């Protein structure tokens, strides 16, 4: 039901190099207060940024697909990279509210855990982030990204979405 799959993708460094190039070109969208695509739920607003597939060049998209399992590639309808810098967070929510039927999260960085989910018994769990690892959870799982502290490096994650 809840599963961490290590080494789900093996070319994280290549992906991150291209993501950082896109970031330097201003391709990320502000999802926070005053942003162009805010993320909010009944629990409040989030503050982070996203690089949508529509804003990625072909080279980055192909690099993401490069080591994804073939069975995943043919059904993924959207890829998104989320960035959380110090002070950023993602408010508690369910992906099922977004209109898609499956979601997988791939960590592109590692460090102090911030991805929190609530299981079927409403027990909180923090997931240890590891580069290239994928976290699979039921679409209706409540989850959040806790606030990144000021002394932490930015965190990046790859979202695979099935619509």
What does each model-found stretch correspond to?
Residues 1-73:
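Non-heme Fe(II)/2-oxoglutarate
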Residues 43, 97, 147:
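Alpha-helical and His/Cys-centered functional microenvironments
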Residues 7, 82-84, 118:
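Conserved beta-strand termini and adjacent loop/short-helix elements that scaffold enzyme active sites
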Residues 72-80:
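A short coil-to-beta-strand element that immediately follows conserved catalytic motifs
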Residues 80-98:
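Conserved short histidine dyad/triad with adjacent acidic residue
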Residues 106-163:
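Catalytic core of Fe(II)/2-oxoglutarate
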Residues 80, 104-106:
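Short, hydrophobic/aromatic-rich beta-strand segments within well-structured domains
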């Amino acid at each position: 039901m809840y599963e961490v799959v290590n080494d789900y993708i093996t070319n994280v460094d290549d992906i991150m190099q291209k993501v950082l190039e896109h970031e330097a070109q201003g391709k990320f969208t502000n999802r926070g207060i005053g942003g162009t695509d805010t993320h909010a739920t009944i629990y409040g607003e989030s503050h982070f940024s996203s690089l949508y597939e529509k804003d990625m060049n072909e080279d980055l998209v192909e690099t993401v697909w490069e080591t994804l399992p073939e069975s995943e590639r043919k059904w993924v309808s959207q890829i998104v990279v989320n960035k959380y810098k110090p002070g950023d967070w993602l408010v508690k929510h369910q992906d099922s509210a977004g209109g898609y039927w499956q979601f997988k999260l791939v960590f592109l960085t590692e460090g102090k855990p911030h991805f929190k989910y609530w299981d079927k018994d409403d027990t909180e769990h923090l997931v240890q982030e590891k580069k290239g690892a994928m976290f699979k959870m039921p679409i209706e799982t409540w989850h959040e990204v806790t606030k990144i502290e000021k002394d932490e490096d930015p965190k990046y994650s790859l979202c695979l979405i099935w619509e």
